[in-house]
Structure formats: structure tokens, C-alpha cells
Amino acid sequence: MNKTIIIPCFNEKQTILTVIQNVKNNLIDGDEIIIVDDFSSDGTRDLLNNLNDPIIKIKYHDRNYGKGKAINTALKESLKEVVIIQDADLEYNPDE
């Protein structure tokens, strides 16, 4: 069963690339990652803009709406049967 991993983020410049790599290490063929940047101002957007990966969709909010809205934005884009939400701050490591 394929899954979507949703990563809502806000000002996660220090952790976002690590989280993305950790999530990618645990994917199977057909899975997707959707990242929603909730109007970061610390350079997170610049890092995301430089990603070029066909399994990653990136959505950007035009202002800070909060985590709930970021999740809802991603859910509208999800094409898979199973959805997992992974916070960008590494509080929960996807390798564990």
C-alpha cells in the first residue's frame, strides 16, 4: 500500500534536509512526500526551492497559517491510500 508522508514546516532550516533524507530512506516505490512551508523566514524556503526530486511535492503558504492548515493543504494534494504526518523538527525521527 502506497503512502504519502506529509511534512509541515515553519522555520526549520536546521533540520528540514535531514528529515527529508530520513523519510526518503524509509520509502518504497510509489510513495510520495508532500512538504508544506508555512511562510518560513529563516531560509527554509530557499532550501526547499533547490530540491529537485520527483517524489517530493512542495507547497508554499503566502502567510503563516499554522500546522493544521499546512496539513490540510497537503491532504488536498495527496494521491495515496495512507497518510503519515512527520514533523520537520525531528522530535520524532522517522528512522525510529
Which ranges hold each PLM region?
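Conserved donor nucleotide-binding strand/loop of the catalytic core
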Residues: 31-34, 45-77
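Catalytic metal- and UDP-sugar-binding loop of GT-A-like glycosyltransferases, i.e.
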Residues: 61, 86-88
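Short aromatic/hydrophobic "clamp" motif used to bind/position activated sugar donors
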Residues: 83
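A conserved acidic beta->alpha catalytic loop
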Residues: 37-46, 90
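Donor nucleotide-sugar binding loop of glycosyltransferases
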Residues: 12-15, 40, 67, 93
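Conserved sequence signature across two-component system core domains
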Residues: 9, 36-38, 61
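Short, well-formed alpha-helical segments that are part of the catalytic scaffolds
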Residues: 12-25
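Cell-envelope/extracellular polymer assembly enzymes that use nucleotide-activated donors
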Residues: 2-4, 32
